[in-house]
Swiss-Prot record:
GO terms for molecular function: ATP binding; heptose 7-phosphate kinase activity; heptose-1-phosphate adenylyltransferase activity; phosphotransferase activity, alcohol group as acceptor. The active site is at D275. HAMAP family: HldE. This is Bifunctional protein HldE.
Length: 490
């Protein structure tokens, strides 16, 4: 958990050079309720259609949606589909499209007809020329790669066998990358893994792996054995076999094979899941992840992708929610930063008829006195909001040596308590603004205050609420704890 969190800030600093076969994906959704009288074929009553960037372009979209920068090099025809792809990719501020135009071939376009009700693909129609790029076009692609390579942190080759990744382009890209100390990830299509010799990582799916190794790949042990032989052929550091519902198996040259099971999710569409895996691996490895962290992140990314319709991209927030423990996320979601929006929470709770309570404090070092007040406050309401003084507010109230813990740490400790439903950080000296916004049914403070001394008591009373004073536990205060710690006492 902590490793992923530590790596996340580095992701926006990474740049991935992605090279591969670009496609325009179109999805036609409709209802199927009858068979054609002209032939034994279902009739789809088309209701809507969507277009998206597919193939290696979807890898680029995933890289950008994760927050990294991507320079994408691909091939299009001189047609509407190619212009649509150029325009669509250019709209993403994190993607720099470098597209070579070949008027002699159409832009690869795939149209899928999908039953809306059953989320079932009925038919796919392809417009494409899968032949390798001509020598002249190939040279343009290679020139583009060599120009962009020095600025990249990692290289990703996405091979759909549509003509971009010729043997010469692959060879020149890998050789140039190795000279510059850049790692190269290849999502291969050819069963001849020797084409990708010298790459850092190959990511075939199970079918591709079986074809390349002539292995049944029925177990992690069998995959590991066949993978090591394939790694000798490809002279690569690692090989990852994606296996859909079976999960993923990573074999590294130095170390044991690692298998991770697939996340249990409802599969809506597998289109582009492999693109997501490749993108997550590239971004995580570029950011400094080790093999294990990168593998688990890619596995989580695949789970998010297959739970979406169409050609899916995965955001860093979605990846984070899938990777991090539920309890960690649940606590984090309880925290509202200073100036944040409380309205959605308040509206939801009021719609349910919940009695909302409020208390506040600095909570610099949580102690039994705090816990008693919070527990009693929660017992007096259905949902408890805790107002938390920001670091600046604490310094003004307690002096320059406080707080001992910053506001984020204090908020996370409070949010982890079952008694607390929401933590709202405020910058002012008092929580009057928060109380005025929340209008709690019950306002709770420790018993060392009188009712008239409690900030916001007038607001609460004017709205029909009550002020509840809780007897404090003697001998417990943050100030005394800090003083005792400074004096070396326990």
């Amino acid at each position: 958990m902590l490793d992923f969190e530590q790596l996340s800030p580095a992701i926006p600093l990474q740049s991935v050079l992605c090279v591969g076969d670009l496609m325009l994906d179109e999805f036609v959704y409709g209802e199927v309720s009858r068979i054609s009288p002209e032939a034994p074929a279902p009739v789809i009553a088309a209701q809507r259609s969507e277009i998206d960037v597919g193939g290696a372009g979807n890898v680029a979209r995933n890289i950008a949606s994760l927050g990294a920068r991507c320079v994408f090099i691909g091939l299009v025809g001189d047609d509407d589909a190619g212009r649509t792809l150029q325009t669509t990719l250019a709209k993403d501020a994190l993607i720099t499209p470098v597209l070579v135009c070949d008027p002699s071939r159409p832009t690869t376009r795939k149209v899928r007809f999908v039953s809306e009700h059953f989320s079932t693909h009925m038919l796919r129609a392809d417009w494409e020329v899968a032949a390798p790029a001509s020598a002249a076009v190939e040279q343009q692609l290679i020139d583009a790669v060599l120009k962009q390579l020095p600025a990249a942190d990692i290289v990703l080759l996405s091979d759909y066998a549509k003509g971009v990744l010729t043997a010469r382009l692959i060879r020149e890209t890998i050789d140039a990358a190795k000279k510059l100390g850049k790692r190269v990830i290849v999502d291969p299509k050819s069963p001849n893994f020797a084409l990708y010799r010298g790459a850092t990582l190959l990511t075939p799916n199970r079918k591709e792996f079986c074809e390349a190794t002539r292995s049944r790949a029925d177990s992690a042990a069998e995959i590991a054995t066949a993978a090591r032989e394939a790694m000798d052929v490809a002279d690569c550091e690692a090989l990852l076999v994606t296996q859909s519902e079976r999960g993923m198996t990573l074999v590294v040259r130095e170390g044991e094979a690692i298998h991770v099971p697939a996340h249990p999710v409802k599969v809506r569409d597998v289109s582009g899941a492999g693109d997501t895996v490749a993108a997550v691996l590239a971004v995580m490895l570029a950011a400094g992840a080790d093999w294990d962290i990168a593998l688990r992140a890619a596995n989580a990314g695949a789970a998010v992708a297959v739970s979406k319709k169409g050609t899916a991209s995965v955001s860093l927030a979605e990846l984070r929610r899938k990777i991090l423990p539920h309890a960690f996320l649940a606590a984090e979601e309880k925290i509202v930063a200073a100036g944040g929006d409380l309205a959605p929470h308040l509206a939801e709770w009021r719609a349910e008829g919940f009695r909302i309570g409020f208390t506040n404090g600095c909570f610099d070092i949580l102690h039994p006195g705090h816990v008693k007040v919070l527990t009693a406050a929660r017992a007096a309401c259905d949902r408890l909001i805790v107002g938390l003084n920001s670091d600046a507010s604490v310094r003004r109230l307690k002096g320059e040596t406080r707080p001992v813990q910053d506001e984020r740490a204090r908020a996370e400790v409070l949010a982890a308590l079952e008694a607390v439903d929401l933590v709202a950080i405020f910058d002012e000296d008092t929580p009057l603004r928060l109380i005025t916004e929340i209008k709690p049914s019950v306002l709770v403070k420790g018993g060392d205050y009188t009712r008239e001394q409690v900030v916001g008591h007038e607001v609460v009373a004017a709205n029909g609420g009550e002020v509840l004073l809780i007897d404090i536990l003697p001998g417990h205060s943050t100030t005394s704890l800090v003083a005792r710690a400074q004096n070396g006492k326990s």
